[in-house]
Design a protein with these regions (language model features):
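Topogenic membrane-insertion module of multi-pass membrane proteins
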Residues: 1-60, 244, 268-270
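Short juxtamembrane and helix-loop transition motifs at transmembrane-helix boundaries
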Residues: 7-17, 41-47, 76, 107-116, ...
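Active-site His/Glu-centered metal-binding helix of metallohydrolases
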Residues: 31, 57, 61, 65, ...
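Hydrophobic, well-structured mid-protein blocks that either form specific transmembrane helices
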Residues: 116-155
Length: 270
């Protein structure tokens, strides 16, 4: 009786390829950002703002899907950053420029340069924010973002555009305010101001009943006036960073004063 043919040796080379499901969501987010650029060029600014918010939803889902399906990869991390640059860096900058900033050129050459410079500053700060985030993935405290996250900055700018469009206020009328908005949002992205990341938010734990009531009220408000409610939420979140940072600084200074007083006070006599 002859011995059976031995099975072929397994290849030691790693399998090449990418995970499909999470990268499909990342591609969808990039497409939404690209569509926002096209819509803004065509003058459909409400559609452009909505597209950026859709990109934000898809961007928030790809990472969670990758963790749930255990399909995380370095390729996905880098691809997600490139998608974020398009959707939350270039797209909002171009929407702001075509909607409002371009009209500064009618006030002179210098003002026109200020318009595109503000748009570029926003896009550049988004790129720097994403690069810094990638280098601090394994080091930074996951409970907080260092600087305003690019989706939040895009949400602030796009909810403002969306709200003004619903109110029939043209961007040309706000061309002196829009660069201030773009610069503030851009600088907050590269700042060291801490923002709550919601990554440590309890998911499986029970929550107070009042939270359910607040969630229902929020949904009703979003249905009644989506753009205005999103703008209010974005403004409150943007303001929370400086407030939380100043509060933390005040607490640290108070602790330092207390320690200094303890060192200076004489020891009690026996």
């Amino acid at each position: 009786m002859t011995d059976p043919t031995p099975p072929p040796p397994h290849s030691s080379r790693p399998r090449r390829g990418i995970y499909l499901l999470p990268n499909l969501f990342t591609t969808g987010a990039m497409f939404a950002g690209f569509y926002a650029i096209v819509a803004a060029i065509a003058g459909h600014f409400t559609d452009a703002a909505i597209a950026v918010f859709i990109a934000g939803l898809l961007d928030g889902m790809d990472g969670r899907i990758a963790r749930l399906t255990k399909t995380q990869s370095e390729f996905g991390v880098q691809y997600d950053s490139l998608s974020d640059l398009v959707s939350f860096g270039l797209a909002p900058a171009l929407v702001l420029y075509t909607w409002s900033l371009q009209y500064l050129r009618y006030f002179g050459v210098l003002w026109g340069k200020l318009g595109w410079a503000a748009a570029f500053l926003y896009a550049a700060c988004a790129a720097l924010r994403l690069a810094r985030f990638n280098t601090q993935v394994g080091v930074a405290d996951k409970r907080y973002f260092q600087g305003l996250a690019s989706p939040a900055a895009a949400g602030l700018c796009m909810s403002f555009v969306w709200t003004m469009e619903n109110a029939q206020i043209e961007g040309a009328w706000l061309c002196f305010f829009t660069p201030i908005l773009a610069v503030i949002a851009g600088l907050l992205m590269v700042s060291r101001v801490r923002y709550f990341s919601f990554k440590a938010w309890p998911r499986g734990d029970r929550v107070p009943f009042v939270w359910i009531v607040l969630a229902v009220l929020l949904i009703v408000a979003l249905v009644l006036n989506t753009a205005a409610v999103l703008l209010i939420i974005a403004v409150l979140y943007v303001l929370s960073g400086p407030v939380m940072t100043l509060w933390g600084l005040r607490s640290r200074l108070s602790r330092r004063r207390l320690r200094a007083q303890r060192r200076q006070s004489p020891p009690p006599h026996e």
